[in-house]
Structures are given as C-alpha cells and as structure tokens.
Amino acid sequence: MAKKSAIEKNNRRKALAARYAAKRAQLKAAAMDENLSLEERFKARLKLAELPRNSAPNRVRNRCEITGRPRAFYRKLKMSRIALREYGSRGQVPGLVKSSW
C-alpha cells in the first residue's frame, strides 16, 4: 500500500490539472498560433509559465486504484500487476483466464 499522503498529493494534482485544462489549452493554442504577433505569442508563453506547476497533466502519476502503487501499472484495468494477479486469481477480473499449456 502506498503512503496516503502520496496518493492524496496525486489526487490534488489530478484536480488541479482538470481545473486548469481549458486555460492551459487556450494559452498553448495562442502561443502556437502563427497568425498572432511574436509579442502576443510570447505573452501567452509567459502566462502559461505562471500557471501552477502541479496543474500540468504530465505531473499526474498513474496509480493503482486499489493499492495506490505507482509502478507496474496497467492502464486498461487501472491497477498494478500485484493487484491484477490477486484479483485475477480470485476470478474478479472479467475475461482474465489463467494460462496453462
């Protein structure tokens, strides 16, 4: 089980990223727009840099929904390899069958 503080910090980052997503996208579009003057594009870049650091989506870490483990994460199932093995052996993951040959 991951530290509760690490899980909560990641949840705060998710919320912050969602809150600033529209503003960030708007500023990015303005900064990349070649029809705007160089000065306006530069101002958009500066405003983008002023946004909270934790509002960037790449600061959010994929974590297991069950244990909070940050590594060995399966995106499709939103769980770590350890939780997947545990739940799979109990037959709680639909479509997952133990392999034998």
UniProtKB/Swiss-Prot annotation:
<comment type="subunit">
    <text>Part of the 30S ribosomal subunit. Contacts proteins S3 and S10.</text>
</comment>
<protein>
    <recommendedName>
        <fullName>Small ribosomal subunit protein uS14</fullName>
    </recommendedName>
</protein>
<dbReference type="GO" id="GO:0006412">
    <property type="term" value="P:translation"/>
</dbReference>
<keyword id="KW-0699">rRNA-binding</keyword>
<dbReference type="Pfam" id="PF00253">
    <property type="entry name" value="Ribosomal_S14"/>
</dbReference>
<dbReference type="GO" id="GO:0019843">
    <property type="term" value="F:rRNA binding"/>
</dbReference>
<dbReference type="GO" id="GO:0015935">
    <property type="term" value="C:small ribosomal subunit"/>
</dbReference>
<dbReference type="InterPro" id="IPR001209">
    <property type="entry name" value="Ribosomal_uS14"/>
</dbReference>
<dbReference type="GO" id="GO:0005737">
    <property type="term" value="C:cytoplasm"/>
</dbReference>
<keyword id="KW-0687">Ribonucleoprotein</keyword>
<dbReference type="InterPro" id="IPR018271">
    <property type="entry name" value="Ribosomal_uS14_CS"/>
</dbReference>
<keyword id="KW-0694">RNA-binding</keyword>
<keyword id="KW-0689">Ribosomal protein</keyword>
<dbReference type="GO" id="GO:0003735">
    <property type="term" value="F:structural constituent of ribosome"/>
</dbReference>
<comment type="function">
    <text>Binds 16S rRNA, required for the assembly of 30S particles and may also be responsible for determining the conformation of the 16S rRNA at the A site.</text>
</comment>
<dbReference type="InterPro" id="IPR023036">
    <property type="entry name" value="Ribosomal_uS14_bac/plastid"/>
</dbReference>
<comment type="similarity">
    <text>Belongs to the universal ribosomal protein uS14 family.</text>
</comment>
